[in-house]
Amino acid sequence: MQACAACAKAKRKCSRQSPACLRCRSRGLDCQYPAKRPSRWVLMPDAPPETSSEEYSPPRLDVETAFRGLDPLLSLDEEMTHAQLSSWFTSIHTWNTVYSERLKTDAFSSYDLDGYVRKVRGWLAEWVQTGSNPFIHRQLYSVRFPRSIQDAYMCLSCYLNKTPANEQLIIRLVEEHSQGLLNEHGFDTAGSLVLRGQSNGLELMDHIARVQALFIYQFIGLFEDKASSHPVTQSRNDVLLAWTKEMVSAAATTVPSGVRDILASSEPGKYYGKELIQLLWHSWIVSETVRRTWNAMATMLGLFGFVKYGRTAPCPGGMMFTTQIGVWEAKSATEWLEICSSRSVGLMQVAEACELLYSAECKQINEFATTTLELTYGQERVQEYIK
């Protein structure tokens, strides 16, 4: 889908949503898209036409085009590949990390920092209690639960239930498991020296598990453990950032062909009809988890840098994620498909999410988006718009 006439004329980025893009809705503009040949599916040709003299560029398949009119109970044409149907959340630009001046925390305060710590602590407790939270999907580890995240789950559960009598014992447990994770992947005690390459050959689920595990250990060490040896804990921030970059890179090359690690059956073969819908859903879960995990990591490191170095602290940047409520919470592939095919899911960059504050969709954003906006633009300002 091309940009609408209003965005094209103003030379502004268009969200290409139907019936009206986000910019037009927020400004009350008449949103008109260029006429196009009606088609239920947009197939990507194997090669450019021989008569064409122009540079060939395969059409990008967005979520509205991909799922419009699809009955989830019908079998899909097996020629419709996973890569084509998933391109709205797996194309190259969806993995970009973007830094914007908007991400400077000009409205940030110590009150917001305390709110962030409470929020993330609540999310981690939610994961321990229910098996999911806004950046760890309930389906993610339903089939395969890597040892690294098992250890983090155990340490986190102990930490959340600590008492004054056993607190130091549990802090030691967290520290030893954190160091054990680094040792397993070839890092020294400070986490600053690579001893041997251990990232090569890691499967995507192992990338995700070790990043989320180290995130948990770092959160406890940086914000929860008042007696922590901060120089050692801080030195591991660089490892966390490096691992997260490797995770994103692995996802960008793996997800487009389909992620089967969290499917009940991982037998190779053709996927179409209901099986293809299930594969699409699980591939989206993994890709969305990767991007939300990046944003959670970037926020934690950014805020810690803000506390330590002030407003000159570097920011890792943000990634795209779905901002509308209901998509992440869908309990089945069919429910997920119905949501994606009937309305906008609000897939956008963190740096662009501020536009939601001025749109009618503001009251429909999910918890992860709300927290992201509060940390970027201040809780008081965001809550005024949401109310």
Positions of PLM-derived features:
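C-terminal effector modules of eukaryotic transcription factors
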Residues: 61-70, 76-133, 138-146, 162-178, ...
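N-terminal cysteine-rich, zinc-dependent DNA-binding domains of eukaryotic transcription factors
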Residues: 1-40
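Intrinsically disordered, low-complexity segments that are common in secreted/host-exposed effector
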Residues: 6-9, 16, 23-26, 167-175, ...
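Residues that flank catalytic or metal-binding motifs in active/ligand-binding sites
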Residues: 27, 149, 293
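Intrinsically disordered, low-complexity regulatory segments enriched in Ser/Pro/Gln/Gly
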Residues: 36-54
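Hydrophobic/aromatic-rich effector regions of fungal transcription factors
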Residues: 131-140, 151-161, 179-247, 302-303
